[in-house]
Amino acid sequence: QVGYSGEKPLYYKIDIKKEIGSTTWRYMQRGYKEAVDHDAQGIILHMNTYGGTAVHADSIRTLILNSAIPVYAFIDNNAASAGALIAIACDSIYMRPGGNIGAATVVNETGAAMPDKYQSYMRATIRSTAEAHGKDTTITLSGDTVIKWLRDPLIAEAMVDTRIVVPGLDDSTKVLTLTAQEALKWGYNEAIVNNVHEIMTERLGVPEYTLQTFKPSVYDDLVGFLLNPALQAILV
């Protein structure tokens, strides 16, 4: 038996379409547990977010990196800041036409950039997240072996720090944000798709499936609100 859907493989969809915070973190915990408990074959994060708190983004990132089942990101327009960190943790990233990913500088509640010690930690966090996906080995027509990162950590760092230069892509004057086409070219997007169904059928090769969307309860929203760190001033 595959999942609780019988013959069709079960996949879960968890929406991240608001500011990353305690409520989003609770959604992710509950949705992930529900997916695993029902033997889901994978999770799709349906993302459209401009960022949020660093602590909750890091918690979601860690959950994804340690996930027992594949987690795929569908960037439905925006994965900015904390959203970029979460997307980079996923096994695969897919983007809608016109989508964007990046701009992960650490800022305070007013939007001002935090001191460099905070940026340094975020650079290391986003770099290690990209590195976690490993390297790919290819053999050229001339017989040479080429080894490269599946997701170049330098590109991830450039999303945080204006001083990072990525030859051929980014100079040292701005924080990096990638369009869907740029992300596809540079290894931060596996395909440009219009919807989740295209991911399932064309990218994952699953023509028939059951897609269960995690539906948070009023209690989930209440708990998330009560756990909201009102004094947590550091955002990403």
What positions do the PLM features span?
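Core alpha-helical transmembrane segments of integral membrane proteins
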Residues: L226-V236
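Soluble extramembrane regions of membrane proteins in the secretory/endomembrane system
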Residues: Q1-L226
